[in-house]
Amino acid sequence: MDTASSPPSAERKRAGWSRLLGARRGSAVVKKCPFSLELAEGGPEGSTVYAPIAPTGAPGLAPPMSTPVSPAPAPADLGPRPRVSLDPRVSIYSARRPLLARTHIQGRVYNFLERPTGWKCFVYHFTVFLIVLVCLIFSVLSTIEQYAALATGTLFWMEIVLVVFFGTEYVVRLWSAGCRSKYVGIWGRLRFARKPISIIDLIVVVASMVVLCVGSKGQVFATSAIRGIRFLQILRMLHVDRQGGTWRLLGSVVFIHRQELITTLYIGFLGLIFSSYFVYLAEKDAVNESGRIEFGSYADALWWGVVTVTTIGYGDKVPQTWVGKTIASCFSVFAISFFALPAGILGSGFALKVQQKQRQKHFNRQIPAAASLIQTAWRCYAAENPDSATWKIYVRKPARSHTLLSPSPKPKKSVMVKKKKFKLDKDNGMSPGEKMFNVPHITYDPPEDRRPDHFSIDGYDSSVRKSPTLLEVSTPHFLRTNSFAEDLDLEGETLLTPITHVSQLRDHHRATIKVIRRMQYFVAKKKFQQARKPYDVRDVIEQYSQGHLNLMVRIKELQRRLDQSIGKPSLFIPISEKSKDRGSNTIGARLNRVEDKVTQLDQRLVIITDMLHQLLSMQQGGPTCNSRSQVVASNEGGSINPELFLPSNSLPTYEQLTVPQTGPDEGS
């Protein structure tokens, strides 16, 4: 990755061509050195240390200036300044292969021995388990007379091999533990050796060496040595489970169900004590057929109680009297039921633990998918930001190819580079599906007008001779072809210049990046949705029940809001209407009643309007003549006085058209 002190693009390209031409004139290849601080590897002593490496020029040429700590503008005649970059182990944008260090080897060995993952670790640890098991079988066979001679001789050599193997493994474990910070140094190694499993390994190795050195006579063991070997074989079986996963699982189950276990054990213990005591009282004077008293002490009664309630039933002690048999039968049914409960509790606890682990695994699959979704969503959002930090990850410098400037190339070197790159991706745990999220490199063709006049491909071919597919070009200039396939074929020939600064990004580059980010977002969203799918029928049922519960809660909330906004029927409907029709409380019935009320109000308004019109007509003129003229006019079909009518949206009523006429006497 280029820093802010990198020269502009034009100067950088001129510097690159000048280095190539300088190598041709000096008949030597100039090693490109863009770093001012680099990891100096492959030294005289083979050591790898951080040291400033100054760029070296060709013979006869002045070396270019090294980048100072405080960069200052360099004169134009002193040549281009070298670019400054960080070591690949420091920069997160570097594409170089990580260097294998001592701590890296320690870490891999430590993970292989202490944190086994993968089929290789499984094969190794399973083989060790089989060897220990075979050795234990031979130790058992040595106790049988007909196999004692063969088993003892074979066991002698197997013990020697196992002692050497476990001793070497213990030393390697102690050495590899230094990769962790808490086990660094002498005190850290002592802390690692104080672990319980490490103490057991040390005891087994030392005791086995003592037994082999002291207890053996030639190629056979002494009797005491064989007894010691048997005990060490039992301890060696603990070596199989170094992580203690079995004990942690058992401890977690017991801790989770501790209340139930304590309750059942307490009640069962009380039943054992009471049953033993009452049987002792009933059978302490009873004599069996042989004339002995079987329950002569309370200890004999406790032994009988333990054998009975644990359903073993040796039958060495049996109640003789009917009182004792009755007490024993009653307490046995009660106590056995409580002594059998811990097995069921532990079994259900293990089943729940397995189910919990399965759920945790399913949930852990969602974490990378969610992280990818968040990352792609943020990148889609950041694509609209004009800040340079948004686009900086797309302008990183690609991996350096040492084959381009090699004076004597080897045909198989490119194949080896590909194999190393594939191995690196495999070591990093990168799957083909995850490679789609890698940041691509953006390149562009150098403009024609910025190329020096003295540059030619012929001079390039005379200095650096490569395979025809890399540097031999038929055309004299770097021209982009018409098809995308030809661009891919000539990618190595055209030597596209990588974009090394954000300012070199164009609009089509940014648009392409936005499209790629949007596609990555949709892919990540689909993967996250697939990871969110339930993996068991119980989860589906639980999901449906939870959805039904949420739906009922929302319906109740909606009903509450409707009652709050419209009101409950009991607040505005009289009791008489409730008793008449139970179905009138619906929304349709309520709307019908509202329409009826509006119609009644309209009729009453019509009547009131008619009465007002009549009063106005009587006040404006003579009521007799006006009334007569109005009626006559209406009977003759002439124009009718508009004051007798309602507004234009209603028709006159029968009472308006037939106004009662009064005589002259009534008018006076």
UniProtKB/Swiss-Prot annotation:
PTM remark: Phosphorylation at Ser-27 by PKA; increases delayed rectifier potassium channel activity of the KCNQ1-KCNE1 complex through a macromolecular complex that includes PKA, PP1, and the targeting protein AKAP9. Ubiquitinated by NEDD4L; promotes internalization. The ubiquitinylated form is internalized through a clathrin-mediated endocytosis by interacting with AP2M1 and is recycled back to the cell membrane via RAB4A and RAB11A.
Disruption phenotype: Mice lacking Kcnq1 show an intestinal absorption impairment which is associated with reduced serum vitamin B12 concentrations, mild macrocytic anemia, and fecal loss of sodium and potassium ions. Mice lacking Kcnq1 show microvillar secretory membranes intact, but basal acid secretion is absent and forskolin-stimulated acid output is reduced by approximately 90% in gastric mucosa.
Any coiled-coil regions, as ranges: 584-620
InterPro entries xref list: Ion_trans_dom (IPR005821), K_chnl_volt-dep_KCNQ (IPR003937), K_chnl_volt-dep_KCNQ_C (IPR013821), K_chnl_volt-dep_KCQN1 (IPR005827), Volt_channel_dom_sf (IPR027359)
Name of protein: Potassium voltage-gated channel subfamily KQT member 1
Gene that this polypeptide is encoded by: Kcnq1
GO biological process: adrenergic receptor signaling pathway; auditory receptor cell development; cardiac conduction; cardiac muscle cell contraction; cardiac muscle contraction; cellular response to cAMP; cellular response to epinephrine stimulus; cellular response to xenobiotic stimulus
SUPFAM superfamilies membership: Voltage-gated potassium channels (SSF81324)
